[in-house]
Amino acid sequence: MTAQQALLANASNNIANVNTPGYSRREVDILARIDPVTVDGVLRIGSGVQLGEIRRITNTFLENSLRASGAKQGKASVRNEYLGRVESIFSLSGPQVTVGSALNSFFSSINQVALNPADIDLRLDIMQRGEELVTAIRGAYQEIADTQTELDQRIAQDIDSINATTRDLATLNSGIAQKEATGVSAADERDQRDILLGKLAEKVSFKTLELPNGMINCYLDNGFPLVSEATARRLEVTTNPSFATGPLPPSLNGGILSYVTFNFGSDAAPAHLDLTQTLKNGEGSIAGALQLRGYADTANTSAFEADGELVQMAARIEAIARTLLTSVNQEYLGPDEDPSTAVHEPSAGDLNGNPPSVFGLFDFAFSGTKDADGNGLPSLTDLTSTGIDSFARILSLGFSQPEQFAAGRDSNPTAGVRTIAPGDGRNAQAIAAMRTQTQSFMAGSLTFTGTFDEMYNSSVSTVGSLKSSAQSEYDVARQAFTVTSVKRDEFSSVSLDEEFANVIKFQKAFQASARMIRTAADLLEMITRLL
């Protein structure tokens, strides 16, 4: 009766936890009782039944597969979400003004002025289209940079979550070992530990090793122990790692990208182990965030030298801005009026006959000397000498009045004398022609040779391909996680039909045992009366 009562109690507990997240159904082992005493010649019927151990019905392979698929889904989800946001920046269609549409409008507007240089309305349109282009470039770059900053903050939040989870795992490890050492089942604690392992897998990929005492160690892919028996190692997010030997490279927003580390030292004398690359190359949401945000080597000097898809996208916008500041501005100056001098003398002029400045069509906010070499021509060397890392953030239009646009060129080049015919649109024609001319676009590790349209279309194609791939990866990962979850539940979760059938079976066995005892009692009473 005691055995059947225990079986009924276990079935009741399973039914009560049918909707408990992470609960693995229990089974009670029942064994035939072995009689240690044997008598020769005596028929041995048996000694009844005894209770064995309470077992959690789990499958290690399924549990590991579920965590692995959860980690893949975590990474794919982050990548799909953030790439979906960035994709709209490079859209070829839609109501919003993009860098691509603004470039087309700007060059088309200049082409119109080339046909009628004296028309103030057309010149006003150039100003409007130029401001739209500047706004589009600055806005696109800033949105990418802000996304990088947001991901940096998300990584810090994920690390806080990882630290809390590993701390709880270490506590459960200790409790499980203590309980099982006394022969008491720690099934509930093991269920809670599996839940925490699944939660941890959503953030980061790791391997586990169960020890004979019931504790589990968790290791990162490089072997670093996140949890070692009853000890959890706390990860840190820092922008001042001890392994940096000089100034750290800037982020796209001008700040510092954080590093995920473990401090073997103290707060006063830190000794950081860099785990950022290990986490980035793994799975989980933190891997997806790091792959998008990028990793900056401490030896880098520019935000565009970091890896990461967001850095690649921002570099394309930055390269367009730098080409506008150098190649386009250089063409805007016109041929040199006096090649015999070391300083370029512009042949282009506005409606008042004034020549444009070195950064006359597109400019940038900087209080120091912009023409560092003093040769009168804008160049990448001039930009580099300013110490500014990103010009897309501070790009501006180089003129503020419509008559200041230099549409014509000197009709009779003579040093010190500039004559611009009223209908001369040669300079505007030269600028408009640059739309279809091959340019060299450079920013950080990015180098692209082609026209403005080819550069932008390549950017659209790259971002679209990344988003499509991320969507496919997410769909596959989500489906794999769902299938694995179903398989795990089929093996480990509570089936009400099965438990109800067990209740009926155990109840009948209990009733039969009770009737047997009652029958034995009746027989004993009858024998007593006869005596």
Predicted regions and their residues:
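Structural signature of extracellular appendage/secretion-system components
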Residues: M1-L531
